Amino acid sequence: MEVFLIRALQFIMAISLLVLLHEGGHFFFAKLFGIRVDKFYLFFDPGVGKWNGSLFRFKPKKSHTTYGVGWLPLGGYCKIAGMIDESMDKEQMKQPPQPWEFRTKPAWQRLFVMIGGVLVNFLLAFFIYSMIMFAWGEKFIATKDMTYGMKFNQEAKALGFQDHDILLGTEEGEFKTFDADLYRRISEARRVDVLRGGKKVSIALNGNLNMLGMIKTEPPFVRPFTPAVVDSVLPGTPASKLHLEKGDKILALNGRAVDSYNEFTDAIGRLQDQMTDARTRRDSLRLRTASIVVTHKATGATDTLTTTLTPDLMLGFAPYNTLAGYKQTHLTYGFFESFPAGIRYGWNVLSGYVGNLKYIFTADGVKSLGGFGAIGSMFPSTWNWYLFWKMTAFLSIILAFMNILPIPALDGGYVLFLLLEMITGWKPSEQLMEKAIYVGFSLLILLMVVANLNDVLRAFGVM
């Protein structure tokens, strides 16, 4: 429960900040051009019975704007006079146009009002990333310093990769570290350079691998190589009863050779698949009975040991942490140096996110969509300011990009119509705008339902 509350608090804080500043971008340009803003709210305020839905509100003297906080913490809004938006205030639109309304302003001014929120979110993301660079710098393990190399699945090996290859880069430049961006770059690469046996080898690819498939397949396309060497043993487990010690190396499981901890976990995964089909307790015990070949570090002797794995198929040891032994790169930045570094980092995040959107239109892409639960789970389970701000910056980029998509009801939908008006002189009617917003809003609701339904299905283990 504590973890849930910590993540929920971080999620609400981040979304509140992003929405407040996003709507503040619209508000700033509206005020700049003399457009009246009727309401500026953090959170939504749908009325309940006779209650107006506001936890707090005030209207300064000589101001036409009511400021407030609603009770539904899912965003916020800025209600601009004379604008057809999701509030669908048709009564206001029936009145004669006024000089202080959105609809009477030149198209270029209306365009700035509409892109104001997106502009603020992009600038905010780049600013946060810059301040992260200034406060914490960058810490990572370069792929070229991962001296054990990588472990590849059969698909990767068919393309020319080999276990223990050290990833260097593509035709676009060097890899930085092992992360989602590395998968994206490999999927788009025509050439991947690796260090194999001390020599540089180039592997030719088609530049169109399915990144989502590379990540989701079991075992994955590529992962850091982890030797099957014992680092520590949990007391009371099968491993402790076998007297396994630090430095012991596992060579085989149930007659199948394993040259890495990666292959060991893959073999356990196959047992789990068989356990699903086990119908009796005898079947379960038979599958849990494991024959393990071990070389003991202390004596150099190799033994074949038999044990019964735990009901959840645990042997009970932690492998040697190769990542802890690798050289870590730590880059630090001065205040002014942090801005170009933060902008570069933010741009890489944005380009990676945009490049991954093509997978939304695939079956696996739809299944990978996540709603509020998935987003909330991305925050750390304990309070960590570094991760909080990094996640907030990432969400700011997502909010900005999703809002600029040319979908009616989003900022990008208005921008599309405004650009058409500026180029052709044609201004869509209010009736057309209302219908377009209905369609766009329906699409957004459908997307939210699918994303949050996926969260529910994952929670019950269906997906």
Where are these regions (language model features)?
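Conserved PDZ fold ligand-binding element
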Residues: 147, 153-179, 241-265, 346, ...
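PDZ/PDZ-like peptide-tail recognition elements
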Residues: 114-147, 180-234, 291-293, 304-327
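Membrane-interfacial segments
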Residues: 28-29, 33, 37, 41, ...
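Functional transmembrane alpha-helices
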Residues: 2, 96-105, 217-252, 257, ...
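Internal alpha-helical transmembrane segments
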Residues: 10, 14, 76, 80-87, ...
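Small-residue-rich helix-interface/hinge motifs
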Residues: 3-93, 402-424
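Terminal peptide-recognition signature
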Residues: 22-25, 69, 156, 164-167, ...
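Hydrophobic membrane-targeting alpha-helices
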Residues: 127-135, 400, 404, 448-455
